[in-house]
Amino acid sequence: MSDINATRLPAWLVDCPCVGDDINRLLTRGEK
């Protein structure tokens, strides 16, 4: 994966509701 794709990946995840929910769930569980 190129640096450009790596940089745009977070924004792409946010644009995808399904994946975004999974990421938010992982982040919330990680913080706890």
Curated annotation (Swiss-Prot):
Reported modifications of this chain: Processed by the macrocyclase-peptidase enzyme POPB to yield a toxic cyclic heptapeptide. POPB first removes 10 residues from the N-terminus. Conformational trapping of the remaining peptide forces the enzyme to release this intermediate rather than proceed to macrocyclization. The enzyme rebinds the remaining peptide in a different conformation and catalyzes macrocyclization of the N-terminal 7 residues.
Cross-link (2'-cysteinyl-6'-hydroxytryptophan sulfoxide (Trp-Cys)): W12-C16
Molecular-function GO terms, alphabetical: toxin activity
Keyword Cell membrane: no
Keywords (A to Z) from UniProt: Thioether bond, Toxin
InterPro entries for the chain: Amanitin/phalloidin
Propeptide: 1-10, 18-32
Residue location of crosslink Cyclopeptide (Ala-Pro): A11-P17
Entry superkingdom: Eukaryota
Similarity field: Belongs to the MSDIN fungal toxin family.
Function (record text): Major toxin that belongs to the bicyclic heptapeptides called phallotoxins. Although structurally related to amatoxins, phallotoxins have a different mode of action, which is the stabilization of F-actin. Phallotoxins are poisonous when administered parenterally, but not orally because of poor absorption.
Name recorded for this polypeptide: Phallacidin proprotein
Gene assigned in the entry: PHA
